[in-house]
Amino acid sequence: MRNMIQYRCFFLDSTGAIRSDEMIECWEDQDAVETARDMLEHRSHYHGIELWRGARRVHMEVRLPDVPAFTIRAAHGL
């Protein structure tokens, strides 16, 4: 039986600075990425995550700020 792998999930502010971290255990990298994304979803005051397995960065993800929709219109006669 194999052991679960330990990961550290860092939570980033709007400038990309680390503001918090949490250890998680998962069977493989993809499970850890999904877990970290779920954690970020429930922590709306953070803007991104970095997921590390020891000295190897597994994943980095940053939320884009909400931008109002806009329309680009072509000028007539071009």
Q: Which stretches of residues belong to each language-model region?
A:
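Short acidic, gly/pro-rich beta-turn/loop elements at beta-sheet edges
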Residues: R19, E34, H59-E61
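A short, exposed loop/beta-hairpin motif centered on an aromatic-Gly-Thr core
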Residues: A17-E28
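A short, charged, amphipathic alpha-helix used as a generic interaction element across diverse proteins
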Residues: W27-G48
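Short aromatic-glycine-(Arg/Gly/Cys) micro-motifs in beta-strand/loop hairpins
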Residues: M1-R19
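Short, mixed-charge low-complexity intrinsically disordered segments
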Residues: E41-L78
